[in-house]
Amino acid sequence: MSTSTATTSVITSNELSLSGHAHGHGHAHQLHQHTHSRLGVGVGVGILSDASLSPIQQGSGGHSGGGNTNSSPLAPNGVPLLTTMHRSPDSPQPELATMTNVNVLDLHTDNSKLYDKEAVFIYETPKVVMPADGGGGNNSDEGHAIDARIAAQMGNQAQQQQQQQQQTEHQPLAKIEFDENQIIRVVGPNGEQQQIISREIINGEHHILSRNEAGEHILTRIVSDPSKLMPNDNAVATAMYNQAQKMNNDHGQAVYQTSPLPLDASVLHYSGGNDSNVIKTEADIYEDHKKHAAAAAAAAGGGSIIYTTSDPNGVNVKQLPHLTVPQKLDPDLYQADKHIDLIYNDGSKTVIYSTTDQKSLEIYSGGDIGSLVSDGQVVVQAGLPYATTTGAGGQPVYIVADGALPAGVEEHLQSGKLNGQTTPIDVSGLSQNEIQGFLLGSHPSSSATVSTTGVVSTTTISHHQQQQQQQQQQQQQQQQQHQQQQQHPGDIVSAAGVGSTGSIVSSAAQQQQQQQLISIKREPEDLRKDPKNGNIAGAATANGPGSVITQKILHVDAPTASEADRPSTPSSSINSTENTESDSQSVSGSESGSPGARTTATLEMYATTGGTQIYLQTSHPSTASGAGGGAGPAGAAGGGGVSMQAQSPSPGPYITANDYGMYTASRLPPGPPPTSTTTFIAEPSYYREYFAPDGQGGYVPASTRSLYGDVDVSVSQPGGVVTYEGRFAGSVPPPATTTVLTSVHHHQQQQQQQQQHQQQQQQQQHHQQQQHHSQDGKSNGGATPLYAKAITAAGLTVDLPSPDSGIGTDAITPRDQTNIQQSFDYTELCQPGTLIDANGSIPVSVNSIQQRTAVHGSQNSPTTSLVDTSTNGSTRSRPWHDFGRQNDADKIQIPKIFTNVGFRYHLESPISSSQRREDDRITYINKGQFYGITLEYVHDAEKPIKNTTVKSVIMLMFREEKSPEDEIKAWQFWHSRQHSVKQRILDADTKNSVGLVGCIEEVSHNAIAVYWNPLESSAKINIAVQCLSTDFSSQKGVKGLPLHVQIDTFEDPRDTAVFHRGYCQIKVFCDKGAERKTRDEERRAAKRKMTATGRKKLDELYHPVTDRSEFYGMQDFAKPPVLFSPAEDMEKVGQLGIGAATGMTFNPLSNGNSNSNSHSSLQSFYGHETDSPDLKGASPFLLHGQKVATPTLKFHNHFPPDMQTDKKDHILDQNMLTSTPLTDFGPPMKRGRMTPPTSERVMLYVRQENEEVYTPLHVVPPTTIGLLNAIENKYKISTTSINNIYRTNKKGITAKIDDDMISFYCNEDIFLLEVQQIEDDLYDVTLTELPNQ
């Protein structure tokens, strides 16, 4: 492939996926006496659009002795045959950023149906019945078909070949072709991916414009006449002659393996005929053999396809005729007037300009196509090779559209059994998962016996009841493999474990290209300190239900060429260090491969029942460095050993030999999977290494993480899931069965296991990694875990983004806190398998879902206990003052609701400019300084409010997830250092509040309640915080503790259910410290901008600066807040009478003492009672540490005071209260009302001339500002539009209204309201006093 920006190549076929079939055994070398190569780019594209999914069976194979070698049924260059086109909702966005005015044809269709036809049929391997006739010789088996080209070459050799093939299963051929317009990807000669950008018809020829991974544009021509070949095309074809591979086995027979290009047709073109737009079909090869005898005569008539073969030197060219069925191109699909004007690269973008109309476009980068799926499609993932034969252990299944079979094939199809049903099966009415179950879920017949090794099969293990049967088959396989290995040490021995009843043998080049096909998106850099070259290999078996999350569907043993016979491709170089002739284990690592040696590389894929992704696992063929490469026999006793190179399993182009390859393990339901030889599934991002999906979209901490080991991890808890990584080495020790559980073991057992690992290290000197202690629950068969590294998740802290940033929906931070939080934890709703938000995008917190494993004494437990301290004996709970330390462990993530409607609150102070987006916004305020809080409401059509007056409780809370006891201790600690017992934590300015209805209630020392009408206008209240953030630090020099200003709004003032909850994170400084802190951060921000050289913009790292702080909407409405009032103050209130002082109802089931009554009264504020046994002793309110009492209240009306109330109702009848003991209270006592003095509120009654009913104006505070706000609330006249307010008394004297007049002379007076407009949007208001009626 040229390295220029524009490369032109030629494909001389409209059938780009055509490949030949070679069925030879004894005379395979005679069949392939010439090496072949297809001219132009190695295309062989076997990827279909959703118009028709038709499988192609390709490849060549050779058979020798008792060992069989079958080529992988890949496209000519190793590309998997089938995939889907549409994007999955879970797949990442394409890296190709901008497409402007693009004309791209056939990238996808807009049809809702999967296929063009109404019915979709699933077939077994089509058994083509052809009589023994014609040039093919006598065919003793009618179920065996021979390609016409092969039959023409074989002559009399066919009979001998067929007799030798009768030793194995018959391998019928069924080539199902598809049109050129179904091709959606081009692959280069070395397996590099080429992304199709456009396909045009120019001068009657197809031109495919593609772009490779290096950003180069390649123009591929598909010609129909060899005379149109360019001069440089022959040079390209000559350069590709060396792609053919030849391997010598012990029998001395020449066996040709498939190369990136097919062997049978080096040049495929059209001969004769005048129509250059002829599409060939392969229908006639399935007709009677009599027609093949007339192939030469048909070729002379015109329109025949000529298969040209030659030797490596380009001489001895032979042409083989073949029949064709001419067809016309669809003129609507391929229009000759389409062309592209300009294509250029702009950084990471590819911009395409065209003069034609824009078409539907879906272009994907890398290997994203392998994971694409849309509704109504059958999921056929990339990397799923389809077998060319029917193996003894299972039935390969193909899915084709109705009518996709060529003419002459349908009548030869024989009905078969697929999962107990006769094929073909009409699946047009089935769902996607049901069709996928047919496609991937065909099970081996119960009567099938394993007669050969190396047979091809694609077996899906998806039912639990077949485990026992498959284990028996595995034992039989292993015994036969071991025997055959001893008899034929040079043969390729399958090492298929349970979950695969066969193997697919592919060449190294095909395997390498398949790895390149499935590329993964570049993940964040792996910053771990672990060594990267773990030469570990072993067989692990996962036991127990629900232990692993994947199910193995395919196992491939790929024989690779030896060092001497390896093709000289730059991307395919495998260091062969194994000699299958040796049955003894080599521990020195110095064994070198002989010219006849082979290396078996394992290719395994995993899928899940009902899932949408398939996981490919294989070795990464690249040059092994150093003399310490793994060495050992391929298949020790037991037949379970698999040799892997010590490279990353990731096949993507971005993965190097020392990088980790990670696959996304999403939407994988837990369940008992089959046991497997090797497992590799890992989460894609670095911070997910310590968490595993819980099966329902959430995440639970992974109890263990296996590194550098071939170990399956099992969770003792049913349904548990573990995410781990696998690394592979080039050597195979004897199979060791290992099961790692999360059960806790004593330190002594861990030391013993560590000693055992050290002994293994001494025996295997080429393994240099230091083995860490691992946990081993029950070792099967007495074997020890092989290089398993367990890492606990509980003690780890990962700094993750929060949902606030928009990019941190996966934010989870494990905490060291181990106490049961009950209902006081922000994550009380975050149980395993439960998501916090409604759309399931925010994972749960770790606090409430860690493994419940008991901690005994002072052991270093691998998991963190959530069991109560009474059962543990010890806890690791942190003291409350330690929360002042701003380390990563203190960062918490609070589930939030993001919406633009409903209640919204703002703190009138700017936010910090140094807070990163992954953290919550924070606001700096000064102690004792009043700051405004604006309460607003935007109409929410989905959740409208019913009442005009709502109650909002503003309180100061701790941000950290403390227990209520710890919060009370912190407030008591602060209160004990104050000069007055009446010192409040949260104060409110009653005079300068706006838009409130009634008076401000002091619920507790750290909470107040206000009433306002959200349907009329917004409200504003000024609050001041009287404590410092550093007041809760245990020592000087520690950063202050962040606090929350939390607002709970109740739709009905009498309701106890929270309608909306919001919070704002603050830090409180003293002596203008907030301003100093803000200035320092601004200077640092300016300095960062001057020196910013990073890849990410600073604006993307930090929250944008705003003039006021918006409250976050919380999801958790159930957690009751902790309200604090000192016990000393409560004793005085209790002496006056608790029932009347609090104005709340008693709990009729309480024990009668004052403490319990007052306790229940405050709980009734939020609708919680303590009569239930499970809440006693753990009250959500716990207002103090020693005695329970009610708070001191200045104003005790818990409901709006606009009801008819006598002014003297606030005078309490002391005799009535003291004469009745509290224990005699039966039903709840009537609530006593207490009205504030007139100095803090004024009521005016006004009406206009055309009105008969007066309108009350609540003037709070009793000032002109309060009057302006009252007029604005009632008459919708803006306060800024009122120029003057006058009062005309009964004597006719008019005067301007001032504060004193309102406070002392206007209470409950009656006025006539007159509004006079003096200018545009400027009014004078006159209140004319009316005589009392």
Curated annotation (Swiss-Prot):
Primary location group: nucleus
Origin: domain of life: Eukaryota
GO molecular function: DNA binding; DNA-binding transcription activator activity, RNA polymerase II-specific; DNA-binding transcription factor activity; DNA-binding transcription factor activity, RNA polymerase II-specific; protein homodimerization activity; RNA polymerase II cis-regulatory region sequence-specific DNA binding; sequence-specific DNA binding
Basic and acidic residues bias locations: 520-532
Residue ranges occupied by any Grh/CP2 DB domain in the UniProt entry: 899-1125
Assigned keywords, A-Z: DNA-binding, Nucleus, Transcription, Transcription regulation
Known tissue expression: Restricted, during embryogenesis, to tissues derived from ectoderm, predominantly the central nervous system (CNS) and the epidermis.
Residue spans of biased composition, Polar residues class: 853-877
Bias (Low complexity): 445-488, 533-546, 567-596, 749-772
Subcellular location: Nucleus
Coiled coil: none
Biased composition regions of type Gly residues, renumbered to the chain: 59-68, 626-642
GO biological process: chitin-based cuticle development; chitin-based embryonic cuticle biosynthetic process; epithelial cell morphogenesis; fibroblast growth factor receptor signaling pathway; ganglion mother cell fate determination; membrane organization; nervous system development; open tracheal system development
Stretch list, region Disordered: 52-93, 439-598, 617-655, 727-784, 853-885
Gene Ontology terms: cellular component: nucleus
Role of this protein: Transcription factor that binds a CNS-specific regulatory element of the Dopa decarboxylase (Ddc) gene. Also interacts with sequences adjacent to other transcription units, including Ultrabithorax (Ubx) and engrailed (en). Activity in vivo may be required only at high levels transiently to activate the expression of Ddc in the CNS.
UniProt-listed PANTHER family: PROTEIN GRAINYHEAD (PTHR11037:SF20), TRANSCRIPTION FACTOR CP2 (PTHR11037)
Family the entry assigns: Belongs to the grh/CP2 family. Grainyhead subfamily.
Protein name: Protein grainyhead
Naturally occurring in which organism (per UniProt): Drosophila melanogaster
